[in-house]
Amino acid sequence: MTKKIKCALIGPGNIGTDLLAKLQRSPVLEPIWMVGIDPESDGLKRAREMGIKTTADGVDGLIPHMQADGVQIVFDATSAYVHADNSRKVNALGALMIDLTPAAIGPFCVPTVNLKEHVGKGEMNVNMVTCGGQATIPMVAAVSRVQPVAYGEIVATVSSKSAGPGTRKNIDEFTRTTAGAVEKVGGAKKGKAIIILNPAEPPLIMRDTVHCLLESEPDQAKITESIHAMIKEVQKYVPGYKLVNGPVFDGLRVSVYLEVEGLGDYLPKYAGNLDIMTAAAARTAEMFAEEILAGQLTLQPVHA
């Protein structure tokens, strides 16, 4: 039996519940706590049925147990508004925070683009951008590694059913954080992000459109090759990530059309927006866990 790093999840909504399913399959992570604020929530009930410890007292219900239970990694799937407070309390106990809200107080992480850059930095909070960011930033990066991107615009369309109350509260933060990461991680000089919640029934699969405006005539062969290589990288942890059309070249503009199907761990397969976020968070946490297990990373308490 290999040793696993113990984890806690804050936020038993759509994202937290889907993430829990993924962590249970991880070879190096062991989820032991699920934290919520509503004792009647479906997510807390499910976690309890799986034998996970739960509290409905928010992060303050977890803090007294973290050291005794050996929790070293905490995932926050709540809301940007409460994340800073949650992170401060968790970091003070020497646990690493993986932020699945658009709070973005820590550095951005999009695994296929910059996961390796986070190795050995001793960071105690990393931000997973947003579901739209995880789906589209690899495509912007695939273009910008070939030639400069003056402007990158992404449009993420998700089913209304897959967007819970936390996501809805954070729509403005979603667009700001995603646009910022299109620039910082994707490499575009200027970024823009648009999210659409589609109420259609039956719910539609997650769809993403990426437009890149280049500074010079596109090298079509190189860009096409780079995009296909990046798609394969993302598919390693989100098998349902696929190129529907493109790259389409029109003057200086390159457009890519994507679809993301989920594994159906919690919501049905149309909710690929959950998968791309939770799989990226799990992959990021696994990298930190592997470092901890190898003795290359010792987490230190951070006092605000």
From Swiss-Prot:
**Residues forming the catalytic site:** 131
> What is reported on the regulation of this protein's activity?
Bound pyruvate or other intermediates in the aldol addition reaction catalyzed by BphI allosterically activates BphJ reductive deacylation activity.
Q: What is the effect of changing residue 208 to A?
A: 2-fold decrease in catalytic efficiency
Recorded hits in HAMAP family, A to Z, give:
Ac_ald_DH_ac
Q: What GO biological process term is on the record, naming one?
A: catabolic process
Which family does the record assign?
Answer: Belongs to the acetaldehyde dehydrogenase family.
Supply the source organism for this entry.
Paraburkholderia xenovorans (strain LB400)
- What Pfam families does this protein map onto? AcetDehyd-dimer
One GO molecular-function entry: NAD binding
Describe which pathway this protein belongs to, using the record's wording: Xenobiotic degradation; polychlorinated biphenyl degradation
Catalytic activity, per the record?
acetaldehyde + NAD(+) + CoA = acetyl-CoA + NADH + H(+); propanal + NAD(+) + CoA = propanoyl-CoA + NADH + H(+)
Listed A to Z, the keywords are: Allosteric enzyme, Aromatic hydrocarbons catabolism, NAD, NADP, Oxidoreductase
Residues under site feature: Responsible for governing aldehyde substrate chain length specificity:
195
Q: Does the keyword Amino-acid biosynthesis apply?
A: no
First-level EC class? oxidoreductase
Could you say what the effect of mutating residue 131 to A/S is?
Loss of catalytic activity. Still able to bind NAD(+), however with much lower affinity
Q: Which Gene3D superfamilies match?
A: Dihydrodipicolinate Reductase, domain 2, NAD(P)-binding Rossmann-like Domain
Q: Is this entry keyworded Thylakoid?
A: no
Recorded consequence of changing residue 195 to F: 4- to 7-fold decrease in catalytic efficiency with aldehydes three to four carbons in length. Does not significantly reduce the channeling efficiency of the enzyme complex toward acetaldehyde or propanaldehyde
> What is the role of this chain?
Catalyzes the conversion of acetaldehyde or propanal to acetyl-CoA or propanoyl-CoA, respectively, using NAD(+) and coenzyme A. Displays broad specificity since it can utilize aliphatic aldehydes from two to five carbons in length as substrates; the aldehyde substrates can be directly channeled from the aldolase BphI to the dehydrogenase BphJ. Is the final enzyme in the meta-cleavage pathway for the degradation of polychlorinated biphenyls (PCBs). Is also able to utilize NADP(+) instead of NAD(+). Is not active with succinic semialdehyde or picolinaldehyde as substrates.
**Positions with a binding annotation for NAD(+):** 162-170, 273
UniProt effect for mutating residue 195 to W? 5- to 16-fold decrease in catalytic efficiency with aldehydes two to four carbons in length. Exhibits 59% of wild-type acetaldehyde channeling efficiency
Q: What is this protein called?
A: Acetaldehyde dehydrogenase 4
Assembly and interactions?
A: Heterotetramer composed of two BphI (aldolase) and two BphJ (dehydrogenase).
